[in-house]
Amino acid sequence: MIYVSLFIVAFTVATIIPFGSEAYFITLLSLGEYNNLLLLIFVSVGNVFGSLFNWICGFYINYFIKKSWFPINNKMIERGNKIFSKYGKWSLLFSWVPLIGDPITFAAGTLRYPIIPFLVLVSIGKVGRYLLIYLSIIWAFKFF
């Protein structure tokens, strides 16, 4: 069940909720009670799926923008489109960066960037980030 909760947290933070999944991931790693590889997989997949959700919302922007509950505003759309247009597909490698990651993944959907290359680039960035966190924690526990 802890893996599912980690997936949900990682998914949620990759959408529009402004908090980090890193603290939860690090806490679970630090406890030493769970399979580290499964923690890495669940946090990574959850976070990538959250970005996929953003892409889908961007792809169907004309439907969602009319909904009162939709949290993305025109300013966020413009910011994401500007970054994505300036740096192209490579900006997706930075989809994990706070404040710019969500607008970039959303912009990729609004600009109809193909889903397979989207998933590959986002996965490289997000899995790479969590892998770096994982390796840092493992290293820290060896020396401290």
Question: Which role fits each region the language model picked out?
Answer:
Residues M1-S5, L31-P103, T110-F144:
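Membrane-interfacial helix-loop-helix
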Residues F11-L28, W96-A107:
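Transmembrane helix boundary and interhelical junction motifs in multipass membrane proteins
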